[in-house]
Amino acid sequence: MLGLIGKKVGMTQIFQKNGIVIPVTVIEFQPNYIIGKKTVDRDGYSALIAGSVDLKGSKVSKPIKGQYKSLKDIEPKKYVIELKGLDGYDAGDEIKVDVFKSVKYVDVTGTTKGKGFQGAMKRHNFSGGPSSHGSKFHRHLGGTGQATTPARTFKGTKMAGRMGGNKQTIQNLEVVLIDEENRAILVKGAVPGAKGSFVVVKKSKK
């Protein structure tokens, strides 16, 4: 499956000829290289391993260096993904942004913005308690326990806690523009993560 590792630059808007405004997210791509292959005989399935963004020298361990010995002029990469069903590439080849030329829709995976410790109303969209009439709770989640049996709170109950910082995929985002010169694409709508965060862009599954 077609895919690239990119960086979310931010959002802007594009005006169509009829005056309609389209909100778009700009995703910029640093060079993506094929750094390895997985085969059916050795791994049980076939796939390409792609990497992007050079890893700082101080963070490169000996095992990682060993993986790149056979690759000429390619530094160890910080972000690595697997691409299944993508043929015609060998180790050391670069995947360029023009692979999305024939793609109309993409799925974008990123890490959502971290919100820290949040209450149940913000985290789970609970209604909270009454706002007036002598209520002693307003933004609480209500009861979490059970009756005499089982006399405990079940694991996984929705409560206050750490919010955000999760892996999330937005599907079927329309590709509005491909800028080969600046190695970027513009997709309609928002994608997960803050400005400058890295995302994985793949051809839409649906």
UniProtKB/Swiss-Prot annotation:
Cellular component terms per the entry's GO annotation: cytosolic large ribosomal subunit
Cystine residue pairs: none
One annotated GO molecular function: structural constituent of ribosome
Cited SUPFAM superfamilies: Translation proteins
InterPro entries: Ribosomal_uL3, Ribosomal_uL3_bac/org-type, Ribosomal_uL3_CS, Transl_B-barrel_sf
Keyword field: Ribonucleoprotein, Ribosomal protein, RNA-binding, rRNA-binding
PROSITE patterns, A to Z: RIBOSOMAL_L3
Gene Ontology process terms (BP): translation
Region of interest: Disordered: 127-151
Known function: One of the primary rRNA binding proteins, it binds directly near the 3'-end of the 23S rRNA, where it nucleates assembly of the 50S subunit.
Family recorded in the similarity comment: Belongs to the universal ribosomal protein uL3 family.
Record text on subunit structure and interactions: Part of the 50S ribosomal subunit. Forms a cluster with proteins L14 and L19.
Protein name in the entry: Large ribosomal subunit protein uL3
Biological source species: Borrelia garinii subsp. bavariensis (strain ATCC BAA-2496 / DSM 23469 / PBi) (Borreliella bavariensis)
Lineage: Bacteria, Pseudomonadati, Spirochaetota, Spirochaetia, Spirochaetales
Gene name linked to the record: rplC
